Amino acid sequence: MSLENIINEAFENRAQISPGTVGAEVREAVAEALRLLDSGAARVAEKKDGGWVVNQWLKKAVLLSFRINDNRVMDGGETRYFDKVEPKFGGFGPEEFRAAGVRVVPPAAVRRGAYIAPGVILMPSYVNIGAYVDSGTMVDTWATVGSCAQIGKNVHLSGGVGIGGVLEPLQAGPTIIEDNCFIGARSEIVEGVIVEEGSVISMGVYIGQSTKIYNRMTGEISYGRVPAGSVVVSGNLPARDGSHSLYCAVIIKQVDEKTRGKVGINELLRD
């Protein structure tokens, strides 16, 4: 039976699985799935033919790992932890860090089962299990990357940014930030929203699946996806009767890679 089939079958019977009852085949299959995620050999979501495809069986493996493992004491350098998932860098020495090609500034924390590509800089931040952070990305101070979130190449997650995680409900897609995006300080992108390549999100913008995304150039309102090259700020849309207004995200312009390369981020956000 394939690794995927073992995971799928075990997940269907998860109510009967515990640390004391799990079989060796399932335990090893879950461990192998987490090794694949940890090394970047597999990822929860990948782009194919221009669209994002979610590998649900890998999400199932992450969820099963919580059922089959007890909490245990873990060393974490300056402190100790009591959890089901080991710290990714817990056993790293100088050679392992050089081979990984990442910078990890204390007290940044990454759980095993997350992939951190070469060239990534982790300021004091948090990356959860199943996440994928691609090369050249900066995860700035107090930013959090949730479970199974997918972060592209050369992305800047500014201070305090929250990228939402998603394990359940199982059918929910992960939050995705594509290549060359800038996410401004204290912004939150959650609930499987996709921010497409080259977009700039201003400081303090909150986008979930129910958030209206208003394109002021076309007057269109959309949900769940920020188109490529968008420059987005927070705003409000008035109610039909004029009695109140409700929060929305506003696309104020769209720029191509050439323009973005010539103009600074702050200049793009000025109107």
UniProtKB/Swiss-Prot annotation:
Localization annotation: Cytoplasm
GO biological process, one term: lysine biosynthetic process via diaminopimelate
Binding-site list for substrate: 103, 140
Pfam families reported for this sequence: Hexapep_2, THDPS_N_2
GO CC terms in record: cytoplasm
EC identifiers of the protein: 2.3.1.117
GO molecular function: 2,3,4,5-tetrahydropyridine-2,6-dicarboxylate N-succinyltransferase activity; nucleotidyltransferase activity
Keyword annotations: Acyltransferase, Amino-acid biosynthesis, Cytoplasm, Diaminopimelate biosynthesis, Lysine biosynthesis, Repeat, Transferase
Annotated signal peptide: none
Pathway participation: Amino-acid biosynthesis; L-lysine biosynthesis via DAP pathway; LL-2,6-diaminopimelate from (S)-tetrahydrodipicolinate (succinylase route): step 1/3
Catalyzed chemical reaction(s): (S)-2,3,4,5-tetrahydrodipicolinate + succinyl-CoA + H2O = (S)-2-succinylamino-6-oxoheptanedioate + CoA
Quaternary data: Homotrimer.
Family: Belongs to the transferase hexapeptide repeat family.
Name of the protein in its database record: 2,3,4,5-tetrahydropyridine-2,6-dicarboxylate N-succinyltransferase
Organism: Methylococcus capsulatus (strain ATCC 33009 / NCIMB 11132 / Bath)
